[in-house]
């Protein structure tokens, strides 16, 4: 059942980290830059840090050497820290956009961020990835201007051999492990769906066949 929870969510998180320039063995290479390395550790923000995609993103970011800040509820803060976050922020109590915080990369795993405000959270050359729909290229140009030159990218999963091998490596070395909120038999699939629609759960929901 743990393996069943990996494909879409973990691949989405992996793709987001890579598109934002956070890769194995790198420091700050935000926005996909591959030039001279900055010796500073990459600062990454993950929203929805204990959700289905976000909890994978925290672990991948940590495995790649980034300093991950995660948004979550106070009830889930301990879990986020155990997953590898260096810091948690209560998304209901703190207005990130007016906080003055800056990150090399922002991954909106929750999918609720206002795109036109994201530039306030990004350092120059920073990158923003989201699980939401990202505009096509001709519209993305306009959005990039709104972001003041910061990069905007979709975190949609891709299914390539190299990505599957990387997930296998991360799991084998113990750097990536799914959190299972609940497991339902097929005859209770409607209960699983209701839980998913309510939100607020941690990690993944499994339906066994």
Spell out what each predicted region is.
Residues 1-209:
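Terminal helix/beta-alpha structural elements that buttress the NAD(P)+-binding lobe
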């Amino acid at each position: 059942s743990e393996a069943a929870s990996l494909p879409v969510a973990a691949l989405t998180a992996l793709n987001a980290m890579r598109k934002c320039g956070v890769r194995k063995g790198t420091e700050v290479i935000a926005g996909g830059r591959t030039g001279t390395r900055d010796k500073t550790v990459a600062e990454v923000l993950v929203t929805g840090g204990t959700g289905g995609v976000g909890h994978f993103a925290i672990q991948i970011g940590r495995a790649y050497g980034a300093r991950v800040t995660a948004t979550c509820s106070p009830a889930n803060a301990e879990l986020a820290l155990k997953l590898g976050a260096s810091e948690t922020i209560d998304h209901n109590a703190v207005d990130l956009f007016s906080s003055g915080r800056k990150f090399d990369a922002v991954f909106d795993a929750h999918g609720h961020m206002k795109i036109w405000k994201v530039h306030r959270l990004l350092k120059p050359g920073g990158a923003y990835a989201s699980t939401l729909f990202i505009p096509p290229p001709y519209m993305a140009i306009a959005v990039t201007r709104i972001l003041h030159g910061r990069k905007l990218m979709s975190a949609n999963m891709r299914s390539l051999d190299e990505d599957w091998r990387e997930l296998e490596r991360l799991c084998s070395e113990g750097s990536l492990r799914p959190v299972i909120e609940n497991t339902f038999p097929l005859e209770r699939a409607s209960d699983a769906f209701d839980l998913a629609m309510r939100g607020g759960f941690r990690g993944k929901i499994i339906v066994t066949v």
